[in-house]
From Swiss-Prot:
InterPro entries: DRAM/TMEM150_Autophagy_Mod, Frag1/DRAM/Sfk1
Protein's recorded name: Transmembrane protein 150C
GO biological-process terms attached to the record: cellular response to mechanical stimulus; proprioception
Purpose: Nonselective cationic channel with high permeability to Ca(2+). Component of a mechanosensitive cation channel, confers mechanically activated (MA) currents with slow inactivation kinetics. May contribute to proprioception.
Taxonomic source organism: Homo sapiens
Catalytic activity field: Ca(2+)(in) = Ca(2+)(out); Na(+)(in) = Na(+)(out); K(+)(in) = K(+)(out); Mg(2+)(in) = Mg(2+)(out)
Positions on the Cytoplasmic side per record topology: 1-9, 86-97, 152-168, 214-249
Coarse class of the protein's main subcellular location: membrane
GN (gene name): TMEM150C
Membrane topology (UniProt): Multi-pass membrane protein
Length: 249
């Protein structure tokens, strides 16, 4: 990969992946240090420790909850930006826009879910927290499958298969983790369920990192223009330009 030919926008999904994963692991280590949760590699419960290392439980009490809220808010914002840029990237390349629109809506709802589970801790408002978890995991999984399909269909720079196949594998892994998570939760096998949850989140974050491959080919600009009350249509502008040129002649 030639760094001189790569857009700086490729770093956005990488920053999202690295920042969010680092933030969540900081939350985990704070909670372990405070004896709020068991370490992921624990075989048995320690005296005085009541909870399995679920992410929501790790970020339930301060100071870990403060870090958790900030991480999830920033992650939601970055995910929303990625969603919009991805939609703009694919818009001129897809014939039927419904799949691209569905991907945008799904990722926006997943981002909204991140803010809910980050700002409404489990013990403070369990119902809203669980709604946020469902939105994040549910629409996040849907987003992965939609983007994998779009990747193979659009085939940007003939890299569709090279990027699409890993995304299909990650999407299948995420789906499997979601199913296993709920099965283990239903059977109260909490240590294994917590490990599956961490694996699920890391797969999500890895998936987002793959958008760097396609973002490196694109440059995005924000155009700002002064508002004019007497806005001229395109035809009127051409007419004025032609009159000006005639006067000059």
């Amino acid at each position: 990969m030639d760094g001189k030919k790569c857009s700086v926008w490729m770093f956005l999904p990488l920053v999202f992946t690295l920042f969010t994963s680092a933030g969540l692991w900081i939350v985990y280590f704070i909670a372990v240090e405070d004896d709020k949760i068991l370490p992921l590699n624990s075989a048995e419960r320690k005296p005085g420790v009541k909870h399995a290392p679920y992410i929501s439980i790790a970020g339930d009490d301060p100071p870990a909850s403060c870090v958790f809220s900030q991480v999830m808010n920033m992650a939601a914002f970055l995910a929303l930006v990625v969603a919009v840029l991805r939609f703009i990237q694919l818009k001129p390349k897809v014939l039927n826009p419904w799949l691209n629109i569905s991907g945008l809506v799904a990722l926006c709802l997943a981002s909204f879910g991140m803010t809910l589970l980050g700002n409404f801790q489990l013990t403070n408002d369990e119902e809203i927290h669980n709604v946020g978890t469902s939105l994040t995991f549910g629409f996040g999984t849907l987003t992965c499958w939609i983007q994998a399909a779009l990747t193979l269909k659009v085939n940007i720079k003939n890299e569709g298969r090279r990027v699409g196949i890993p995304r299909v594998i990650l999407s299948a892994s995420i789906t499997l983790c979601v199913v296993l998570y709920f099965i283990l939760m239903a059977q109260s096998i909490h240590m294994y369920a917590a490990r599956v949850q961490w694996g699920l989140v890391m797969c999500f974050l890895s998936y987002f990192g793959t958008f760097a491959v396609e973002f490196r080919h694109y440059r995005y600009e924000i155009v700002c223009s002064e508002y004019q009350e007497n806005f001229l249509s395109f035809s009127e502008s051409l007419s004025e330009a032609s009159e000006y040129q005639t006067d000059q002649v």
